[in-house]
């Protein structure tokens, strides 16, 4: 990776207003931006976390996540995307304020009506109905992104001391066949399903997750 060979985008500022911020890369490869102000440095960190989290649930039942400070503060998978959003919000409606919202399927008008009640920075989905877009555009600064089908980077890079750390991305997802029952009482099939679901959330949580 050579920053000098990448497209550079000057951000409003870095993590704090007194810090300069830049993005090297092509966001247009990943998103179509339909509405709202420009993404900030902190927005990009949250959006990156949101996209990587939802990648774990690609092609599954309607799933909705609300992120704050790079972590999911609400998450649900339900029969409809509206119910997934409502239940994700119920996880922590306080932290959801000003958060990043992401869905793994199209957002319809009913879901947009619910979202519109919340102050949120960014909404991400693979598509939106025309009615949903009209509702979500009701807030001038709300950023509305359409996520494209794209391969995400297979390596993670960060600076450390006077150099750079590089590691392979964690693509391992636990399966039922990987589990060993270490207790006298074995979990039920539903409990195993819940544990595997939770493990994908834990994998994408930046803390000592339990």
Residue ranges of predicted features:
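Active-site loops and adjacent core secondary-structure elements that bind or stabilize anionic groups
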Residues: 1-133, 139-171, 191-209
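Active-site/ligand-binding-proximal alpha/beta "capping" segment
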Residues: 174-190
